[in-house]
């Protein structure tokens, strides 16, 4: 008899409330290659043993509820239940533990990040027995990851499409983020692209507002892009934000972008939702569009150390749902991001096989079994003086995006783009010659500025600008 129909009459039904740990805490369990594994940072309420708290997490995120129900006898709970198989105390923290939970693969719909998250980070996060709960990491088994298409194209295909190799790509978010007319917006795009940038970008706030409707923006941006391409001989792109209030409207905008012949569109994947994002990724793969992903709203979810979801989990979810770029912090700019933590999830985005490394916050070995990689985007409060550090930290397979660091140049957008391109080329050349970017970075930028007045002006404007605040999310 199948597990779905078997009835355990021999056991009988005993109504009442049982401790979760009697069923869901299984310290002798040996995890399977097909299990989805989760690491939760949990802070139990006073008086709640960690074993009971960990078991409650496993129960409430899988088959359990607060009381025994007679329909438990109509299925095989041993087959479907989540299991808390290990608990460890967090060093230096009082009453805080890492609970490791294994979930059988049958609990989750194939190819659906939405269903995965609904279970694992659903109602359990409001459970009263826990003061706080944070999902630190997930291990996605190959048997499950192969049910997703992942990024529409991936790093190598993007390199081949753009014919750009051996260096990071350069981008810029058009500012002011709101208020420009479509024609002035298109002019700003043109100036940046002709100055030497590879990409320009819609701000995540830009959708289709009264001051600039989406179709007008698309038309003026496409004109600017093709004009810059013709003048420079380089392939250019602009991230046209197709995020919309309905999926039907989103798809209409993506279709218009494809008809205009632009190479890339953009989506706000957290505010837009995983279902819409996965559908858009499928559309982009089928229609030859690259997909840039912005993470607006992520800090609401991931910034607090004790509660929420760590960004490394959101990054893994995005790689499965689909995106060719995603914003990943800068380490050196104005936005949150500790170096070791950031490089940990950058590797999870780009690499095929990532070993467990607790020093970088990676709780599980992750094998993506040849799923295409995602380019991390460094963006937020960066300028020419940051270029050596960014090149050294992120390497070639990245997008370095300077918004204010381009458009804030005293001579205008095109000189700002020139300054950033000169700085990048100088850093790549110095690195390839064996120079130490971390130690000699400022000297390398000064040397390049001798031959570029645009770079010299940028260096003078931003020489005193620093964002030196301690990161909230540390190991």
Swiss-Prot record:
Residues recorded with modification N-acetylproline: 3
Gene transcribed to yield this protein: rbcL
Other information: The basic functional RuBisCO is composed of a large chain homodimer in a 'head-to-tail' conformation. In form I RuBisCO this homodimer is arranged in a barrel-like tetramer with the small subunits forming a tetrameric 'cap' on each end of the 'barrel'.
Sequence positions that bind Mg(2+): 201, 203-204
Protein name from the UniProt record: Ribulose bisphosphate carboxylase large chain
Site (Transition state stabilizer): 334
Active site: 175 (proton acceptor), 294 (proton acceptor)
UniProt record similarity statement: Belongs to the RuBisCO large chain family. Type I subfamily.
Superkingdom as given in the UniProt entry: Eukaryota
Modified residues (N6-carboxylysine): 201
Cellular localization per UniProt: Plastid, Chloroplast
């Amino acid at each position: 008899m199948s597990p779905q129909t078997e009835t355990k009459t021999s056991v009988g039904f005993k109504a009442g409330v049982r401790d979760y740990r009697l069923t869901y805490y299984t310290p002798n369990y040996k995890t399977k290659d097909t299990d989805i594994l989760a690491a939760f940072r949990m802070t139990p309420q006073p008086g709640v043993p960690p074993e009971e708290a960990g078991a409650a997490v496993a129960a409430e995120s899988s088959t359990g509820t607060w009381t025994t129900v007679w329909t438990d006898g109509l299925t095989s709970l041993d087959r479907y239940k989540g299991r808390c198989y290990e608990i460890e105390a967090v060093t230096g923290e009082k009453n805080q533990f890492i609970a490791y939970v294994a979930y059988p693969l049958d609990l989750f719909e194939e190819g659906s990040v939405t269903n995965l998250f609904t279970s694992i980070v659903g109602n359990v996060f409001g459970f009263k027995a826990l003061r706080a709960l944070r999902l630190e990491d997930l291990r996605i088994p190959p048997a499950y990851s192969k049910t997703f298409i992942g990024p529409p194209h991936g790093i190598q295909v993007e390199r081949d499409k753009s014919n750009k190799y051996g260096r990071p790509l350069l981008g810029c978010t058009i500012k002011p983020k709101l208020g420009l007319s479509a024609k002035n917006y298109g002019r700003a795009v043109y100036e940046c692209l002709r100055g030497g940038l590879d990409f320009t970008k819609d701000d995540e706030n830009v959708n289709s507002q009264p001051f600039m409707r989406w179709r007008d923006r698309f038309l003026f941006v496409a004109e600017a892009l093709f004009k810059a391409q013709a003048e420079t001989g380089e392939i250019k792109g602009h991230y046209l934000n197709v995020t919309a209030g309905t999926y039907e409207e989103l798809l209409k905008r993506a279709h218009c972008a494809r008809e205009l012949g632009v190479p890339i569109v953009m989506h706000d994947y957290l505010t837009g939702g995983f279902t819409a994002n996965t559908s858009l990724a499928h559309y982009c793969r089928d229609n030859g569009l690259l997909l840039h992903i912005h993470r607006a709203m992520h800090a609401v979810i991931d910034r607090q150390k004790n509660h929420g979801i760590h960004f490394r989990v959101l990054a893994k979810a995005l790689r499965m749902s689909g995106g060719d770029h995603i914003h990943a912090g800068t380490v050196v700019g104005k936005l949150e991001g500790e170096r070791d933590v950031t490089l940990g999830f950058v590797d999870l985005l780009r690499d095929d096989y990532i070993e467990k490394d607790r020093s970088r916050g990676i709780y599980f070995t992750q094998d993506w079994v040849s799923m295409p990689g995602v380019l991390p985007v460094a963006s937020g409060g960066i300028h020419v003086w940051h270029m050596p550090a960014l090149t050294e930290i992120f390497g070639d397979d990245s997008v370095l995006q300077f918004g204010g660091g381009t458009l804030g140049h005293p001579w205008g957008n095109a000189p700002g783009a020139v300054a950033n391109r000169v700085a990048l080329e100088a850093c790549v050349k110095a690195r390839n010659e064996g120079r130490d970017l971390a130690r000699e970075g400022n000297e390398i930028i000064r040397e390049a500025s001798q031959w570029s007045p645009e770079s010299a002006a940028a260096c003078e404007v931003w020489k005193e600008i620093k964002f030196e605040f301690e990161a909230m999310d540390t190991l």
